[in-house]
């Protein structure tokens, strides 16, 4: 099926973010994969996934943070593996575009991403480790 590129919803993202669906698995697969492009400074809100999430940096420079851990920088080829139900955010560096392939699964009960508050400028602006 054709899945067009769309703007990410502002309730769950800060800044301009475009989502380009790559894969929605057919049962029994619950895999979803989306290319996500963030403009400089754009990022997700805090969120978590019931089965975790894997991010593969494709281009530009990005950031990712799991709650309670330092901000990490992502460059093309880098992979971030987010554990199940770990609150986290990810997005572009302040002065760079960033695209990653985001891969996750829904839980067996069908539940997916749980969204929380937007990431503060203070949390976002922390120097990467």
How would you describe each model-predicted region?
Residues 1-30, 112-129:
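A short, N-terminal "cap"/entry segment at the start of jelly-roll beta-barrel domains
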Residues 18-21, 32-49, 84:
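Conserved short histidine dyad/triad with adjacent acidic residue
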Residues 35-39, 48-65, 103-106:
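Short, conserved beta-strand element in jelly-roll/cupin
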Residues 44-46, 64-65, 73, 87-94:
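Short beta-strand His + acidic residue motifs that chelate non-heme Fe in jelly-roll/DSBH
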Residues 24, 48, 56, 76, ...:
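Conserved strand-loop elements at the edges of beta-sheets that form or border functional pockets
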């Amino acid at each position: 099926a054709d899945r067009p590129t769309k703007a990410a919803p502002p309730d769950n993202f800060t800044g301009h973010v475009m989502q380009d669906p790559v894969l929605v698995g057919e049962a029994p697969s619950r895999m979803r994969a989306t290319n996500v492009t963030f403009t400089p400074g754009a990022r997700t809100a805090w969120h978590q996934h019931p089965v975790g999430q894997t991010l593969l940096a494709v281009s530009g420079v990005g950031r990712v943070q799991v709650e309670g851990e330092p901000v990490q920088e992502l460059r093309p080829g880098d992979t971030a593996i987010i554990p199940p139900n770990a609150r986290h955010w990810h997005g572009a560096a302040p002065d760079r575009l960033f695209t990653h392939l985001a891969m996750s699964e829904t839980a067996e009960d069908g539940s997916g991403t749980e969204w929380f508050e937007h990431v503060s400028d203070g949390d976002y602006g922390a120097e990467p480790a």
